[in-house]
Amino acid sequence: MNQLNISHNWKIKSFTSITFCDHCGSMLWGICTQGFQCSDCNFSAHSHCTNLVTLHCNNNKNNSKPNEKPATITAAAASSSTTTTTTTETSTNTAASTTTTTNNIDIKNKDKTPTTSPFSSPILSSYNNNSGNEFCSNRQHKFHKTSKSITKFCNYCRETTFTISGEPVMCSECRYIAHGHCQTKVPLNCIIPYSSPINTINDGGNVRHHWVEGNLKKSKKCIHCMEPCEKSFSLAHYKCLWCHKYLHSSCFDKHNPICDFGSLSDMILPPSSIRLLSTTATTTNKIEKLIIEEQQPQLSSSPSSPRLNINNNNNNNEIIEWELIENSNMPEKVLFVFVNSKSGGQFGSTLIRKLSSLLNPLQIIDLIKCGGPDSTLQMINRYLAKHPEQTNRFRILVCGGDGTVGWLFKQMTKHLVPSTIPIGIIPLGTGNDLARSLGWGIGYDGEKLIEILKSINEAKTIQMDTWSIEMWDDDKPEDRRVIEMNNYFSIGLDAMVALGFHLARNANPQLFTGRTVNKLWYTKIGLEEFVTKNFVSLARIVKINVGTREIRVDRSIEGIIILNLGSYAGGVDLWGANRKDNQTHSDGTGNQFIDDQTLEIVGVTSLPHLGSCLSSISSPIKMGQADEIRIQVSMPSIILKDKSNEIETAFQVDGEPEPIEVRNCTFKISFFKKVSMLSNRSFKPRIENHDSDLSTFQISQSPNLYSPPSFKNPPPNLNQYQQPHQPPQSQPQPQPQPQQSLQSPQSPEPINNNTNNNNNNNNNNNNNNNNNNNNNNNNNNNNNNNNNNNNNNNNNNSNNNNNNISNDLTNNSEVNPEKSTNNEKTNDNNNNNNNNINTPFEPISLPDENNNNNNNNNNNNNNNNNNNNNNETNSEKSYTNNCDEVD
C-alpha cells in the first residue's frame, strides 16, 4: 500500500530554456535560479508562488511498484485541512484490492493556513476504487492521436509536446493531453458522465465543475474574480469540461463549485439525470478489472436499456448501459446526437471527438460502432411512455447524409418514437438535399461546433411530409416491399447514372473521399453512361396513374423525377422558385411546399438535358402535382430479347439506386406521415402552414381521382373531399341549415347549395358594398334592383371562383377590382365560400380554357338572369374538358 504525499518537493532550479510558472502563467525571470520546481511532478513556480499553489503533487510515479497503477487524483472539498483519500494497488496475481486511509494533508506549503471560502471548494478528490461499486469512478481516458504544438503541454509530466519523442495523445472526452510514453502512467480521472457520488452533491443533485489544468485555447474571464485568464506557455489556470469556463489557479479554492453547464445548458444531459446500470469493456492493461472482459463486445439484444460503445487508445471497447432518471434536472431541450462515423471522409470520427468534449459523452451515439440507434430510441420510447408530457424536451441531431437521416426515420417508426420529436441535421453526405432544404448548409467543413449547437438550440420546428413507396412484382403481388421516401423518387435516366456511381463507389471506396471528388466521379460516370448506353424511352415501358386517371408520358422523356423537396442532386431547384401569395406559375402549376402532402412530377429528355437542368441552364418538363401516384413498369419482350444481359432501367429513392430486374412491376407512392424537423432560424423554408399543429393534423384517406397538376382549390364536383371548416369569429357565421346542407353527403348538388346559401346569408352583408360599387351606374335604380344586383354579383363571384378553381386561376372578385377596399371585402367573402373545400392536389389549367372561362365570366356579368344555370354547366364542362386534355 502506498501513502500519498500531497506536498510538493520544492527545489531551487536554474532553467536553461524559457520557462513559465505553472501557477500564475508568467515567465520565470533571471539568469540563474529563476524559480522552484517540484522534483516529483515537475511543477515550476516563482518563489512567491510556491506558497499559493493549490494543485497537489502526484508523486506516486516514484513510489509505486512496477505493476501498480497510479492513484487517481481529482478535485474535492477543501474547506478544512484534512480530507479522506483512497488509494488502489493492483497486483499481478489478484484482480483488485482496495484500501482506504485517512491522512492529514497540508494544503499550502510551508505551513501556510489555507484561505477559507463560503463554498465547499473542490481541490482534491480520491476515488473509491472498489470493483464491486455500482458507480465505476476509475474511468479510463479515451485517447486519440493529436498534433504536436509548442503550446500543448503534457498534463502528466508538464513538458511541452513539441519534442522529438512519439506522437502526443488527447482524451476525446476531457481533453487531457499526454505524451505517448506518459500515456500508461496518467491517473484514471476522466470525466464521469453518469450519476455518481464523486461528482454530485447529495442535496439537490447539482453537479460540480470538472476542472482540467492548462492548455487554454484563448483568453477568457475568470468566473470568480472576473479578471482575464491569459493563455500561457504552461499549465496555468483551469477549464471546466461542462460549462467551458475558466478559473485562475489562485482562485481555485474560492469559487462556487456548482456548475451551470454554460451556454449549452438547455441541451446538455447532466450526470445527475443518468443512472448507470452496468459497464462492460475489454482491456489490455494489467489494472484493476472493474469491468467485465469480452472477446467481441456487442450490443445486448435485450431492449431493456441503451448501451454506448466507446473506443479508446488501447483498442478497448467500453459498453455503458444506462437509463434516464426521473428528476427535475432534465434540461428543456435534451439533444441526442447520432453520428455516422463513415460519412464525410474523416469528419464523422472528428465530430464524435469534438461533440464529446462539448456535450455529455453519453449523448453522442456512433451509429457504426454501436450497431445503430435502436437501443437509444428504445430508451427514449420507454421514458416517454411514462412521461408523455415531456416529449417536447427531446431533440435529435443527425450527423450524416440524407441516407443516414432516412435510416433514423425508419428506426423511429419501428420503435414507435413520437414523430413530434424535432430532428436537426449536420450534413456530412454528398448531396445533402434535406439539410439544404432546412437551411443547414451544403455540408460540414470544420466550422465551430459550439456555434452550430447554438443554432440547433435556437432553431424553429416545422413539419415535413414523408412518403411510403410500396413496390411489388406483378407476377407475385403478395410479395411486397415498402420504402420510406423523404426527398425524391426517380426512374429511368438519372437513376441509371446514380446506379453506375453507386457500383463504382462500392468497388473502390478509397477513391471517393469527399463531396467535391464524388461530384467529379459522378460527372465522369454520367458521361460514360451517355456514350456507352442507349437509355430507353419511358413512354414505351412506364404508365403513370393518379387514381383512375393516367398521365401521358411524352415519347422524348427518358427520366421521371418525383420531388418532395425543393432541392435535388446537391441543391438544384427543378420545380422553380415559389411565387408570392401562392400565385400560379406561368405554366399553370402551383408552388412547391414540403408540408402540403403533394408531390411534384418532372421529366428529362436526355442526359444533356439533365446536365443542363442541374446547371440551371434549362428547366425540366413539368408533368404535374399529385398526392398519390402509381407507376407501372412493363418491359416489352423485344427489349428484353435485344439486351438480355444489360439493366434496362433502374430507380432510386433518396439517392439509393437499385436496378429493375423484373419484367413487370408496380410502384405505389402515397402519403405516410408528417415529421417534425429543425430549420435554421435565419433560413426561410418552403412551408405552407407556418403554424402547423399535429393535434389537428388530418391525413387524407382517399386518393384523388384526378390528374396531378396543380392548384390549391378543387373542381366544383369534389364534394367527397370537403373538410369541415369553421369561419373566423370576425366574419359572419352561416346559418345552421345551409352548413348542414354543405356537409351532407346526400345532397345532390352540394357545391351549388353552398353557393346559393352563402349568397342568401351574405346578401345583406354585401348589400352596402355592392351599392357603393354601383353608385356611379345605378343611382336611379330602386332597392329591388340593388338586391338583384347583389345576388347576381355574389353568384358571379362564387361561380367565377369555381371556374377559376377548375382552370387554376386566382381571381377572387369580379366587381370593381380597381377599388382596393371593396376588393378586400369581396375577397373575404369569397374565401368564406371556398375555405370549406380542401384537396391535396389540383389539375392543370390550359390556356385556351382560361380564355373561354374568362369570356364565360364576362357573359355571366352581363346576363344576370341566367347566372345560376350557365355557371354550373360551364364549371362541369370546363373540368371535363380539362381531364380530357390531360388524358
UniProtKB/Swiss-Prot annotation:
UniProt-listed Enzyme Commission number(s): 2.7.1.107
Main location (coarse class): membrane
Name of the protein in question: Diacylglycerol kinase A
pH dependence, record text: Optimum pH is 7.0 with 1,2-dioctanoyl-sn-glycerol as a substrate, and 7.4 with 1,2-dihexanoyl-sn-glycerol as a substrate.
Residues of the DAGKc domain: 330-473
Composition bias type Polar residues, residue spans: 114-123, 805-820, 872-887
Subunit structure: Monomer.
Gene name linked to the record: dgkA
InterPro entries reported for this sequence: ATP-NAD_kinase_N (IPR017438), C1-like_sf (IPR046349), DGK (IPR037607), Diacylglycerol_kin_accessory (IPR000756), Diacylglycerol_kinase_cat_dom (IPR001206), NAD/diacylglycerol_kinase_sf (IPR016064), PE/DAG-bd (IPR002219)
UniProtKB keywords: ATP-binding, Kinase, Lipid metabolism, Membrane, Metal-binding, Nucleotide-binding, Phosphoprotein, Repeat, Serine/threonine-protein kinase, Transferase, Zinc, Zinc-finger
Family note: Belongs to the eukaryotic diacylglycerol kinase family.
Membrane topology: Peripheral membrane protein
Compartmental location: Membrane
